[in-house]
Amino acid sequence: MVQDVNALRWACVVLGLATVSFLTACGGSPRTTPPPPQVAVSIHPQGASVVAGFQTQQFSANVAGDPKNLGVSWSVDGIGGGNSAVGVISSSGLYTPPSSAGSHKVTASSVADTSKSASAPMGVTDLTGVSTYHYDLARDGVNSHEFALTTADVNRNTFGKLFSCPVDSAVYTETLWVPSLNVNGALHNVIFVATQHDSLYAFDADAAPCQQLWHVNLIDAAHGGTSGETSVVWSDVGSGFKDIYPEIGVTSTPVINPSTNTLYVMSKSESGGPVFYQRLHAVDLTTGNEKFNAPVNISATVSGTGDGSSGSSVAFDSRSEHARSALALVNGVVYISWASHEDTFPYHGWIIGYSAANLQQQVGVFNTSPNGGLDGIWMAGGAPAADASGNLYVATGNGTFDADQNTAPNTDYGDSTLRISTATGLSVTDYFAPNDQATLSLNDTDLGSGGVTLLPDQTSGPPHLLISGGKEGVLYLIDRDNMGHFQAASNNQIVQSFFADNGSFTTTSFWQNNLYIAGAVQGGTDNLKMYSFNPSMGRFNTLPSAQSAHSFPFPGATTAVSSSGASNGIVWAVDTSCYGVPSPSCGGLNAPAILFAFDATSVATELWDSSQAAAARDQAGNAVKFTVPTVANGKVYIGTRSEVDVYGLLP
């Protein structure tokens, strides 16, 4: 028996057995081997977007509980290493996109434990650029090439402010975006931003922190300026309302010709006297230098005896005219539109066209009230729309109207929506004026406070439709081929009219047969509303199909829609009610803009807004009136008083 015990003890010593049963038998305390560490994988960034055929995206992964440091294997849409259809990812996590657009999933899987992985959504866009106001000549406000921002991913946990780009003054222009641009020998996605200090900036659209590529001032000697020239002091042109304060330089959104890498932009400035200058510039996208015989000093004269006329002609006045509407590029011609500064007399609405290839060549001049006055083309910064034939469509605000008269003068178009031919010069070929035009003008409830949107061609009813609306809150659905002119008794000559909002200072958006509008007049508020269009009837349901819980104070919001074709529609809108002096909604105070995202299938569903996150994580710069969001390649850009703010999927 003693020999058996000694033998067992010797076996315990020699074998060093660690099982509970043997330790107990050997007279030791029970011990257990600790379990292996739990494997966990994380991926960075948590979502991304690239341009097809140009950008790459570097992913990294961290594996906890991997003592042998075996790392990860990479796949795209479940395909190890990916392929040419979904994109290729290297062993180091560098993703190279396919040549076609789409949404993909990049996955990092632990080698130590293949059941553990982490994934990130990967959007690949084929968007060729945002080269003009509201995306296209229809001014429908839709980017249907957005494959990174989805209704599932735009929320406070995964979406927010990425970075800001500081600028020298307020940004009233919409941000424009160009992909794959060679600047100083390197390819960048680039955003272009203009300010009221007459500055123009090019920034890398993706780099955080912000990377400035170049900056020019449009009134220096290299850009046609004279000695001592400055941006315009607000009090030198206004009536004391401080609508744009404290300086006026570039107000209208530029336009880009991507085929020549040229940006066209309007500047306003003054020098001692004061003497006022308005110039159209043609700027090289890669350097900021002038080209195409630019700049050109704006000057024009039309026949007429209207306000400010001399003899039998009306001349363009560089002091009183204000290029508020965005520029349009149509068939090789750049068109600029004007109204007034704070209704300072005398003024007219003007449209002037210049050859995009030679700015010294003026190709068309149109005045909305050559024998009257107080007309203007404001459209809350919206651009003239244009159809496939090159016709321009604009809405005018207030002023003289006599186009319905059978005898001359009958060329004044106050409170009208116009079709203007560009075939030879500029001439009105059709128009619509509401039956209460005189009342609109008398009460300053002008039609032209809102922009014009062209609807897609229809297969039932009139094939060519447009939407126009103003301060009265009525939307007019008009047949572009037969606009209806003026009818004193009613507006029955047009396709449809209905009260849609509190008053429009916006350009509407139209996506998947839904119209989006957030309108509000001074002192009022209204919700973002969506109206359904019935293509078989060729008309709108006059009751909103959905509306937001948030109510937008004056001036409402011009929306933009991003989507992946017909899916993942998101409506973006900026509350700019605290835009500063005079901002009736905020008692003249200036406060941050608030960017909102809504589900485009029902705007009653708010996905996110920039005031939600704690510690002001997503707070924008101080608001500017009529700001339009630009969505491109997984990011949203908005201009403010001192910076451009960039939002996207959080890293």
Where are these regions (language model features)?
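Bacterial N-terminal signal peptides that target proteins for export
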Residues: V2-V14
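Extracellular/luminal low-complexity segments enriched in Ser/Thr/Pro
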Residues: I89-G102
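A short beta-strand micro-motif common to beta-rich folds, especially ectodomain repeats
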Residues: G102-D113
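A short beta-strand segment in extracellular, disulfide-stabilized domains
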Residues: T56-N62
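Bacterial Sec-dependent N-terminal signal peptides
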Residues: V20-H44, T114, S119-M122
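Short, well-ordered beta-strand segments
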Residues: D66-G82, S119
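Short, solvent-exposed loop/linker segments at the N-terminal edge
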Residues: S49-Q55
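Mobile, glycine-rich extracellular loop/lid and propeptide segments
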Residues: D126-S421, L426-Q458, P463-H485, F505-Y531, ...
